[in-house]
Amino acid sequence: MQKVRKLVTTIMIAALITAMEGTTILPLSHHVKADTNTVSQTSQAENDLTKYKKINGIGDNTVLGADFSHYQLQKNAWKKVWKNYKGIEVSNVFEYVRSQGINTISVKVAVNPAKDDSYLSLEYAKETLKEAKKAGLKTNVVLLYSDKITYGNSQELPGGWSVDKAAEEANKYTKTVLEELKRAGATPTMVTIGNEVNYNFLNLSSWDGYCAMAEISKTVKDAGIKTAFSFAAPEKASDIQYIIEQLGYACEKYEGAGYDYIGVNIYPNTHSDSYVKELKNTVEEKAAGKQMIISSVKCPWKDSEGKASITTQTKSIYDYLQATINEKNAGGLIYDDADFVGAWDSFFDGNGQAMSSLAIFAYAQGNQVDVSSYKDPWE
């Protein structure tokens, strides 16, 4: 009987093919398939995220920052777009990252950036800050006091500035920037003075550099804006004590000077979360009332050795964030190049689609946002 059924089925299929000869068969539209057959599936990434619980001590004062310094260049010159986890373009990327737990947008600003550094312009920063503020986000401006990005071993003065007048020029420049931001309706929530300073702010001696930072901090605070400093990570975490002491002495020199945040730039291949915990503990002990944050960090989701993944990126961010937070320190971090489409350590792939690691900022606050993606069963 089974053989008879197979024979009948074969004859029917052959007859159907014969009847359809000469007939053009139009393929189903991909969009039609997506609309009628696409199913929502819970991704492995979502399962991975559920193990991350709310961090004790996290709150409104915790800095959950994303650097968007490249945003204007990507949007206007490179015509990049940003998409959600389902690959659908979002109408407002600032509102979108806010929905994923980000509460602060940060931009870097150079004095006279040119060519490849043009993305660091004050004009770009104004536009990004205004968009971020409109989306209900806090904002941070990192003033580089250089014409390009600065690092621990490279604090190059802007063109036309001399070392002997650098402190005066820097304070004057700061006032000008704050005035321009105010006129543009882009006054930030906080200003970070310098980036990855390593005892060499404005190429001055250690003490003179700290004094210059303190004087600038007074200018910022006089404008009603919170201040932060960004330092290169010392070889030993406990060495942050020396920086704290020098800042304290320098701030005493200028009545009204002070700071709200002390930030350290972290590199995952060098600094562990245990290192960050020691930084936090030292700041708590030696600078009570000051908030220790990671002023810049980025973790790879892809590397040449094939060891990095979205899962490892997610874990690194959570561990670093947790290391900065306890009941005494609201902590937080600013994720560098967060907006960069296609970078191996950003939150958006080459197509602009968000990766689930972005959602760790929400999960760290106890909010389990939906990171499920659509899978087309025809593909």
Identify the function of each model-found stretch.
Residues 69-71, 110-112, 144-146, 193-198, ...:
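Active-site beta-loop-alpha junctions enriched in small/polar residues
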Residues 1-11:
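Bacterial Sec-dependent N-terminal signal peptides
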Residues 121-124, 150-259, 268-288, 303-319, ...:
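Active-site cleft segment of glycoside hydrolase catalytic domains centered on the general acid/base Glu
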Residues 12-24:
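Hydrophobic core
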Residues 50, 54, 254, 286, ...:
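Aromatic-rich peripheral "rim/lid" segments of glycoside hydrolase catalytic domains that contact
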Residues 39-138, 144-169, 192, 263:
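N-terminal substrate-binding region of glycoside hydrolase catalytic domains
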Residues 61-65, 103-106, 138-140, 187-192, ...:
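Structural preference for beta-strand elements that scaffold enzyme active sites
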Residues 21-40:
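Sec-dependent signal peptide cleavage junction
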